[in-house]
Amino acid sequence: MKISLFSAGMLTASLLFSVPTPAHATPDYASLIEQAYQKFKLNHDGKVADYIPALATYSPDNFAITLATVDGKIYQVGDVKKAFPMESLSKVFTLALAMEQRGPQVVLDKLGANATGLPFNSGLAVVLTKGAPENPLVNAGAMSTVSLIEAENKTARWNKILDNLNAWADATLTVNKPVFQSEMATNQHNLALAMLMNSYNSFYGDPRETVEIYTRQCSVDITVEQLAKMGAVLANGGKSPFNGRQLLNESYVPQVLAEMAIAGLYNGSGKWLYRVGLPAKSGVGGGMVAVVPGRYAIAVYSPPLDDAGNSVRAQQTIEYVADATQANLFMAH
């Protein structure tokens, strides 16, 4: 185990952010994540995503946990050096960029905040609502988010998105070219979604350019430590505990967390919130992050997914740690 200390429908948003710190002593996070790692490392439930060929090459045995606190401490165990593509995890941070640029009311009006109850790549959800904004964490809404980013041109838009990811991760992130090429070769469905949204005037840029940027964004590699640091920004009121930068207006953080609670685990979001009571976001690359406002963020990497596209071991691990630290936001503390 490696531990490094002192590293540089709508759910009510206020509930998701304004949670008092429990009076009990600070948990032994190092021991807790070690227990979770040992408890779940031999669980082989789920299946590695293969609809994007490059994702099928990742080992189902990969498993890593990082917990990052709002005072800049890092606790981690497992395959923490192994990078993986962000995939849908990236949606949260581009949403935050759009929120910072445009404000929460524009985001609500143009991107929405309702669960679809359908898979993350559903075209039916678009048709049933006649293109009305649903939420920015399903594929159609996430591509609309990319198109909403203020920039002079395609290159400038991508640079703003990548610079934003770098700032949140406190690192220099790069695109995984084999994953990007694999996704570009198999992204006809996303292109169709973008065209469909555009036909309903719910798209705010060129569909083909936007899909390329979105695909590039999803192909950015990250480690579980970097992901936990990104989550810790949200736990710390939009300010990075690691580089000291205010990356998101503190008053906008509850809205980002609300979107995560509504649709962060796709059509598994409701059951997750019912069981665990935390805003979270997953990606089909096997990563997942959950946020405990005012306390910590926890990130897990494990490629095998359930039927909804969420990492099985990540859900188990985060639920275990959340229960042990009384992190459920719906509990009286």
Q: Each predicted region: which residue ranges?
A:
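Active-site-adjacent helix/loop patches that line small-molecule binding or acyl-intermediate pockets
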Residues: 28-35, 43-44, 98-217, 233
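Structured C-terminal helix/loop/strand segments within mature extracytoplasmic catalytic/sensor domains
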Residues: 235-333
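Short, conserved catalytic-motif segment at the N-terminal edge
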Residues: 52-56, 68-82
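Short glycine-rich loop/turn motifs
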Residues: 60-65, 192-194, 285-288
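Beta-lactamase-like hydrolase cores
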Residues: 24-65
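Positively charged n-region of N-terminal signal peptides that target proteins for export
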Residues: 1-5
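Bacterial N-terminal signal peptides
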Residues: 7-18
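Active-site SXXK
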Residues: 72, 84-108, 230, 298
